[in-house]
């Protein structure tokens, strides 16, 4: 019988007590003991404990417990661990012994890293025992902190991925128990755990990292506060953890996965790091946060929502590297869960970055969105994908080509999903249309587009049937532009196929024909085909090389590719074979690759036609009538350009022709009309009665069917339909009396006249007589006109319109139109209809019928003018122009739409565009925005085609070379039909409408861009003289049709010349004698000079040219293409309010004109009235000259400030003294503050917009004014005269000397000051200005301005020539006056036509500047020759922001007066203040100051004392956040601006956009008069049209309180 374990242990204890000498005997005893101990249960009876007590005592003997052999130590550890298990919960030994035991047990754990070792199993048992029975808690009771630390360190060091799960869980449980049972988490334990966290660490195993995360996850409530404290301390730079070498970013990542609640207080610190100035910090935290949000299955907590939002805002970071990193993480974020809750926010942020200024960012955004869309087609909204597609128009070829590739890939994926039956895959059939639009892009052209359509658009294994289904949907979604591009591609392919077939045919017969003649034909064919390639000259050379090839296989393959019977599969295979024959190294490889696509039927083949016809039948049988129309339309288009594809489809076409479905029948007729000549033989074989079927449709079908049936009948017969049409024609004429078929019969008669004129002429007289007497002279029933609408025309009216169309078609045959006679009779009919609305004045009909007939007659004139323009009398031309006067808006829209269409298609002379000017509604001309756009489009189109016209003209002085050639026709029409007799009628109001019409057309001719700006000064110099010459030529001519109207024409020309002077704000500079241009001889002839009259013909002064009359016209509210100008007869306050209503500013010129208009109106009533010195209500007239002078003085004061800031004028003591005087002055006038005028804010550009809105009205702020400012203001205020005559005289002088100049391409207000003025010191100016107190109040908008003042000093010609394209790539410094400092940037490009440089600043801002008018310095030429700017060499850069307090070098303000600042929002285009550096400023100071301020580049938000946002008080943002937001948003608007510059060549000026303005409301009291200073300011200051509304309001506010007249 075996001994019991306790008995064995008793014996073993006795043996151990004797201390065995050998190691082996000791190991044997310990092994036996371990086995016995494992067999005992926990908490055995006392007898058992007593029995094993000898062993318990023996095993802890020092010589055993402290044995040095590792095997002995392991067995001892195994035994004592079992002993602790058995005696639990009581400790088997004393505290000191237990410490030694746990030290032994912990040392045993160190061997767990050897999984394959013989002792691994025993160590695992020890680990399990300790974990299961929680004996490790005793270590805490014994305060074995070092031992506990060793446990943590050991476990994390020995953890392996190949450990059994029991080992991992046991270690995890032990560590959790030690943490949970401890009163406080020891810092070193936490650091041990955190030190193992982090991604991609080579020094830490994944198992250890996973173990640490599991422990933290289970102990999160216990360790949360300590972790939070550690992280906050580490992120705030606490030196206590600086030596821990723990990367808290990596810790945060793992904590977010295992214990996100521990990060609750970390969010603000992460947000702060996202806004840090240091790039490395931002990049690191971006990487962390990006990976956190990319974790799959994670929902962003509320705590991290603020971090997420700021993370998205980093997409606007000024550093490209940061933005690129965020895009990568956003991509991972969306791919992990495309439908996550934050997807819409992410996508919205991505859309904004599609307009980033960096092309690599834009490309990456496209990549991100397309990658996400490919993974889940419905994850990205269609509207977002269409925004991505707009990058096909990107200015960078890198972006547009990449976008093309990704959209093509996306469409392929979409096709595959559709083929798999996944119906919920979104709609991407619009993508091919966007690709087709790129046909007009010079970087793509047809070569790229055709390759994509043929080879890349659909999956390679896609069946023809699937392709057909998609093509039908694609085609049905095309808009006009896409349809036109698609037709263009098909047309080019047809031309190349025809020319290649002709070339191959000639090549086969070359041996038998005349070689030179053949060569000539071949070269001509090559030239024709080359035009369809992207590089025609190179292509033509490649054709010549191809012609020399002797390889018969190449020619055989090309012949097969041109065969329409070759299937798509065969064509693709033989094309590949041809390219293999050549190999990629061959010079013709790329050329033949493109040619084989263009001349083959890879795009559409006969297989397509058969599948489409089958699809029609399927939809017909399924009663899907809506799906039939796009199929028939698609077939009709293929029939136009690929008629050979319908060979073999005759049977289906005949069945469709016989079908009752009208859409199928009409579509088939169109196909037969286009492709009938190709398939006529097969048609006759299949159905000999097809011509009879077509004849029946001609009579019984509707008008459209009848039209196609006639053309089909002519197409399918061999003699061009002469025989068939003769029979049909006879039958139709005989049926004219049958009212049932009259519409179709008239249609057929017109078509026959166009196709077969000999047939039509056989009975033409009968047809014409019938239409004239039996149709056009029909009387309509009397109807109440008041109840009729445009659609209520009578059947008789409709029949008359059909008759007119038939007569018109008879004079527009397809061949030999000029051989027709008798068009005068038709024109006579049209004249009567245009005049009376009927063919005879005696005929009565409703106003609706007359309107319809007038419209039909006008459209007929437009069509006839293509061939008969020289036969159309001037009177009919005038009547046609007046068609928009029809009192039905629909009639105007239809007619003007036709004019626009015909002129754009080059089938109508531009002179008919005059009709737009006769669209008069009330007192407005061309009120419809659509019609305005169309007229502008016509003018733009005419400018674009002018070069081609010039090359075709022989008369260089011909006015028809220019778009302006419509002016003679317009003047003639106005003189005859709108203008009263100028010698009899002296009522100015009768000429107001003529002035409006002229103003509109001239402004559009001069300002031909959509925003009303002339492209550049050079072009204005070309256009203005041309228009002036036209008017002068008319004045020197005589009316051909009615000499009595000549005076009217001359008077209208006077108005036109005054409008030009008004728009250009300068007298025309016509060098030499005026050379008349060639005017239309049908309108004007040179005037005969009377003998003895020495005056030049046509130069006599007419009363309409009188200045007072012109002032009346200029006071009108005029609508032009550029702007809405002067508001008539309104008070000053109304003028200002109206100017603010649209958020724009009113330029100086316009306000002066308004004041002039008021003056002419009110002067009469005020002559005899005495006026008080001041009018507090501000209802009197304003001294305009006074205001102009004050504005000029404001500029002078700004220059004084600028000089002072340069250190030129005042010492610190002097500046302090002036500052004190200013403060005193301000304090005295505090109680006199008046209301502050709100200024409309200005967007950066017309296309961009800011998501951040600021209040329009800023708070009231007191500004300090320098003494010289106050004195200068005093001078001007003192100069007001109380005499009404004197004041009127002053106003008149001002109006003559100050002309508000319309800016053409400048954002700056310009002020010219002589060098002597610049040299004046502040003290001298103060002395000359005199004394007095002044009050200066100012309110700023929400953002500061950058003012531009040019001409501060004369520059040499040599200096002017230094700015050119050689600066590209150089680094320069550009002066920002309102910031009082330079900013560094790189010159990226130069537009020589506009003399504009594109500057990329270091912070990412982009600005387009004319450096010749800027203050700048060259820093680094990049190896190029250094050039200087217009500035002086000794310029100082030591400057401070205007309005801010002076600071010491340490940044402490000198003045303790507390002020608040207006926060800067998004940087807008500022007015450029161009300032010369004073020569005597030490440059070292400026460089030192530059270094100090380089850290604060973005702190340029206020050039005025600080104020708070109204409505947003207390809102604070960190500096970095403000920087990134502003710059990121600027990036978007810069790209919009650059794309507009490239595609539309437009640039905003201050007249078209609203700008932020600074208010200067100053009121002066008791100032002394100083005429000398006033004259100096008046002579050297030039007011600008870019003066803002705010500044003008302030001046008005100062002046209206004083007496005027």
From Swiss-Prot:
It is found in: Nucleus. InterPro entries: ARM-like, ARM-type_fold, Pds5. Gene3D superfamilies: 2.30.30.140, Leucine-rich Repeat Variant. GO terms for biological process: cell division; DNA recombination; DNA repair; homologous recombination; microsporogenesis; mitotic sister chromatid cohesion. Signal peptide: none annotated. HEAT repeats lie at residues 50-89, 96-136, 146-183, 184-221, 261-298, 302-339, 341-378, 380-416, 552-591, 644-681, 723-758, 821-860, 961-1000, 1050-1088. Residues 1575-1585 have a biased composition (Acidic residues). A motif (Nuclear localization signal 2) lies at residues 1426-1433. Residues 1211-1225, 1279-1295, 1477-1495, 1514-1527, 1534-1574 have a biased composition (Basic and acidic residues). Residues 1425-1442, 1464-1476 have a biased composition (Basic residues). The modification Phosphothreonine is found at residue 1588. Disruption phenotype: Weak impact on meiosis such as formation of some chromosome bridges at late anaphase I and telophase I in forming pollen, but severe effects on development, fertility, somatic homologous recombination (HR) and DNA repair, especially in plants lacking PDS5A, PDS5B, PDS5C, PDS5D and PDS5E. The modification Phosphoserine is found at residues 1274, 1299, 1524, 1562, 1584. CDD domains: PDS5 (cd19953), Tudor_Agenet_AtEML-like (cd20404). Residues 1155-1182, 1203-1262, 1279-1307, 1324-1353, 1423-1605 are annotated as: Disordered. A motif (Nuclear localization signal 1) lies at residues 1226-1233. Belongs to the PDS5 family. Interacts with the cohesin complex. Interacts with DEK3. This is Sister chromatid cohesion protein PDS5 homolog A. The gene is PDS5A.
């Amino acid at each position: 019988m075996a001994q019991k374990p306790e008995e064995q242990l008793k014996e073993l204890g006795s043996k151990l007590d004797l201390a065995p000498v050998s190691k082996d005997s000791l190991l044997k005893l310990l092994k036996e003991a371990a086995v016995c101990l494992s067999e005992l249960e926990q908490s055995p009876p006392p007898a058992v404990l007593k029995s094993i007590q000898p062993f318990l005592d023996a095993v802890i003997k020092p010589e055993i417990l402290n044995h040095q052999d590792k095997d002995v130590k392991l067995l001892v550890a195994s035994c004592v661990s079992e002993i602790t298990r058995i005696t639990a919960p009581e400790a088997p030994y004393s505290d000191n012994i237990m410490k030694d035991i746990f030290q032994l047990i912990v040392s045993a754990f160190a061997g767990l890293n050897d999984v394959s070792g013989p002792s691994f199993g025993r160590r695992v048992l020890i680990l399990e025992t300790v974990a299961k029975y929680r004996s490790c808690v005793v270590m805490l009771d014994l305060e074995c902190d070092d031992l506990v630390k060793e446990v943590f360190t050991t476990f994390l060091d020995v953890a392996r991925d190949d450990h059994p799960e029991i080992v991992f869980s046991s270690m995890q449980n032990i560590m959790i128990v030690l943490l949970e049972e401890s009163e406080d988490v020891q810092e070193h334990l936490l650091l041990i755990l955190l030190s193992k966290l982090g991604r991609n660490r080579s020094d830490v195993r994944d198992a250890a990292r996973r173990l640490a995360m599991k422990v933290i996850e289970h102990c999160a409530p216990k360790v949360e506060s300590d972790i939070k404290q550690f992280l906050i301390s580490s992120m705030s730079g606490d030196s206590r953890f600086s030596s821990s070498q723990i990367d808290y970013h990596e810790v945060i990542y793992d904590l977010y996965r295992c214990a996100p609640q521990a990060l609750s207080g970390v969010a603000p610190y992460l947000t702060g790091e996202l806004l840090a100035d240091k790039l490395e910090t931002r990049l690191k935290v971006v990487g962390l946060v990006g990976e956190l949000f990319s974790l799959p299955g994670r929902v962003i907590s509320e705590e991290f929502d603020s971090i997420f939002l700021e993370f998205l805002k980093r997409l606007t970071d000024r550093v490209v590297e940061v933005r690129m990193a965020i895009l990568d993480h956003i991509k991972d974020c969306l791919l992990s869960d495309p439908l996550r809750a934050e997807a819409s926010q992410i996508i919205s942020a991505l859309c904004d970055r599609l307009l980033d200024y960096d092309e690599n960012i834009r490309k990456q955004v496209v990549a991100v969105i397309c990658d996400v869309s490919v993974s889940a087609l419905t994850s990205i909204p269609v509207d977002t994908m269409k925004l991505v597609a707009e990058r096909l128009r990107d200015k960078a070829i890198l972006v547009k080509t990449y976008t093309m590739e990704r959209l093509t890939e996306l469409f392929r994926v979409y096709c595959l999903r559709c083929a798999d039956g996944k119906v919920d895959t979104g709609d991407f059939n619009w993508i091919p249309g966007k690709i087709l639009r790129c046909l007009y892009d010079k970087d793509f052209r047809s070569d790229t587009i055709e390759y994509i359509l043929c080879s890349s658009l659909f999956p390679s294994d896609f069946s023809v049937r699937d392709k057909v289904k998609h093509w039908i949907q694609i085609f049905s979604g095309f808009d006009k532009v896409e349809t036109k591009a698609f037709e263009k591609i098909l047309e080019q392919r047809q031309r190349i196929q025809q020319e290649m077939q002709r070339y191959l045919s000639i090549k086969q017969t070359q041996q038998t024909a005349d070689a030179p003649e053949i060569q000539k034909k071949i070269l001509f064919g090559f030239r024709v085909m080359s035009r369809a390639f992207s590089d025609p000259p190179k292509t033509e050379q490649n054709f010549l090389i191809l012609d020399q090839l002797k390889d018969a296989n190449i020619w055989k393959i090309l012949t097969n590719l041109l065969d329409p019977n070759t299937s798509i599969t065969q064509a693709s295979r033989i094309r590949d074979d041809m390219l293999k024959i050549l190999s990629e190294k061959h010079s013709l490889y790329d050329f033949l690759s493109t040619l084989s696509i263009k001349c083959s039927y890879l795009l559409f083949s006969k297989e397509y036609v058969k599948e489409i016809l089958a699809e029609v039948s399927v939809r017909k049988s399924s009663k899907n009538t809506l799906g039939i129309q796009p199929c028939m339309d698609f077939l009709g288009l293929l029939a136009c350009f690929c008629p050979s594809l319908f060979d073999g489809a005759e049977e289906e076409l005949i069945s469709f022709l016989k079908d009752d479905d009208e859409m199928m029948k009409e579509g088939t007729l169109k196909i037969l009309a286009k492709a009938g000549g190709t398939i006529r033989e097969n048609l006759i074989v299949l159905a000999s009665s097809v011509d009879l079927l077509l004849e029946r449709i001609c009579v019984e079908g509707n008008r459209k069917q009848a039209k196609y049936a006639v053309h089909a009948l002519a197409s399918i017969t061999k003699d061009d339909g002469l025989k068939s049409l003769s029979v049909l024609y006879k039958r139709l004429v005989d049926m004219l009396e049958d009212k049932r078929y009259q519409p179709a019969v008239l249609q057929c008669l017109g078509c026959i006249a166009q196709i077969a004129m000999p047939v039509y002429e056989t009975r033409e007289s009968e047809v014409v007589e019938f239409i004239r007497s039996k149709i056009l002279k029909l009387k309509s029933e009397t109807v109440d006109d008041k109840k009729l609408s445009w659609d209520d025309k009578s059947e008789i009216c409709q029949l008359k319109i059909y008759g007119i169309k038939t007569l018109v078609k008879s004079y527009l045959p397809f061949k030999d139109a000029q051989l027709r006679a008798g068009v005068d009779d038709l024109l006579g009919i049209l004249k009567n209809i245009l005049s009376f609305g009927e063919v005879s004045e005696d005929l009565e009909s409703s106003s609706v019928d007359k309107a319809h007939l007038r419209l039909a007659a006008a459209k007929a004139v437009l069509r006839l003018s293509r061939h008969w323009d020289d036969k159309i009398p001037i009177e009919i031309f005038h009547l046609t122009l007046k068609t928009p006067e029809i009192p039905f808006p629909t009639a105007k829209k239809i007619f003007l739409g036709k004019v626009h269409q015909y002129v754009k298609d080059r089938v109508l002379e531009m002179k008919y565009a005059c009709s737009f000017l006769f669209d008069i509604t009330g007192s407005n001309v061309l009120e419809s925005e659509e019609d305005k756009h169309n007229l502008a489009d016509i003018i733009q189109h005419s400018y674009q085609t002018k070069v081609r016209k010039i090359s075709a003209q022989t008369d260089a002085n011909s006015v028809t070379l220019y778009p302006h050639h419509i002016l003679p026709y317009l003047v003639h029409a106005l003189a005859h039909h709108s203008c009263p007799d100028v010698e009899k009628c002296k009522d100015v109001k009768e000429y107001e409408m003529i002035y409006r019409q002229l103003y509109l057309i001239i402004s559009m001719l001069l300002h031909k861009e959509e925003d009303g700006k002339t492209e550049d000064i050079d072009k204005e110099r070309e256009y203005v003289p041309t228009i002036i010459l036209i008017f002068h030529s008319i004045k020197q001519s005589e009316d051909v049709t009615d000499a009595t109207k000549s005076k009217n024409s001359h008077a209208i020309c006077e108005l036109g010349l005054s409008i030009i002077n008004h728009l250009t704000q300068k007298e025309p500079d016509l060098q030499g004698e005026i050379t008349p241009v060639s005017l239309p001889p049908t309108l004007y002839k040179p005037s005969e000079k009377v003998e003895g009259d020495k005056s030049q013909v046509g130069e006599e002064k007419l009363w309409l040219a009188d200045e007072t009359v012109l002032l009346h016209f200029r006071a009108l509210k005029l609508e032009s293409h550029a702007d809405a100008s002067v508001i008539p007869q309104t008070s000053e306050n109304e003028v200002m309010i109206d100017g603010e209503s649209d958020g724009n500013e009113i330029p100086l010129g316009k306000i002066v004109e308004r004041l002039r208009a008021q003056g002419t109106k009110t002067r009469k009533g005020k002559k005899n009235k005495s006026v008080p010195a001041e009018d507090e209500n501000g209802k009197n007239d304003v001294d305009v000259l006074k205001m102009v002078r004050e504005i000029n003085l404001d500029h002078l004061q700004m220059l004084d400030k600028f000089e002072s800031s340069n250190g030129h004028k005042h010492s610190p003591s002097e500046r302090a003294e002036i500052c004190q005087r200013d403060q005193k002055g301000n304090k005295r006038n505090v109680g006199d503050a008046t209301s502050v005028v709100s200024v409309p804010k200005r967007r950066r550009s017309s296309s961009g917009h800011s998501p951040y809105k600021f209040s329009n009205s800023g708070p009231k702020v007191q500004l300090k004014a320098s003494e010289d400012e106050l004195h200068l203001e005093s001078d001007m205020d003192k100069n007001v005269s109380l005499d009404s005559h004197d004041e009127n005289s002053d106003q008149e002088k001002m109006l003559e000397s100050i002309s508000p100049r319309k800016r053409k391409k400048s954002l700056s207000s310009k002020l010219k000051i002589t060098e002597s003025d610049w040299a004046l010191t502040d003290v001298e100016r103060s002395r000359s200005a005199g004394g007095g107190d002044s009050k200066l109040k100012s309110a700023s908008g929400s953002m500061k301005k950058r003012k531009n003042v040019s001409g501060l000093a004369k520059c040499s010609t040599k200096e002017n020539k230094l700015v050119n394209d050689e600066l590209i790539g150089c680094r320069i410094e550009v002066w920002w006056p309102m910031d009082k400092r330079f900013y560094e940037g790189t010159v990226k490009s130069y537009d020589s036509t506009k003399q504009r440089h594109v500057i990329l600043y270091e912070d990412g801002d982009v600005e387009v500047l004319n450096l010749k008018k800027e203050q700048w310095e060259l820093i680094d030429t990049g190896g190029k020759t250094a050039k200087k700017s217009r500035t002086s060499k000794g310029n100082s850069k030591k400057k401070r922001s205007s309005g801010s307090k002076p600071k010491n070098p340490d940044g402490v303000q000198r003045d303790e007066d507390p002020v608040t600042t207006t926060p800067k929002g998004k940087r807008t285009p500022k007015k450029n203040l161009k300032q010369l550096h004073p020569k005597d400023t030490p440059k070292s100071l400026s460089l030192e100051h530059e270094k100090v301020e380089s850290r604060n580049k973005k702190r340029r938000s206020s050039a005025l004392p600080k104020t708070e946002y109204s409505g947003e008080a207390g809102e604070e943002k960190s500096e970095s956040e403000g920087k990134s937001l502003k710059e990121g948003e600027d990036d978007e608007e810069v790209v919009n601006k650059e794309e507009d510059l490239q595609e539309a060549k437009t640039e905003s000026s201050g007249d078209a956009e609203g700008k932020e303005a600074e208010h200067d409301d100053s009121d002066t009291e008791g100032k002394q008069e100083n005429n000398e200073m006033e004259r100096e300011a008046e002579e050297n200051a030039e007011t600008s049209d870019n003066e803002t509304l705010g500044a003008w309001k302030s001046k008005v506010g100062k002046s209206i309180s004083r007496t005027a007249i």
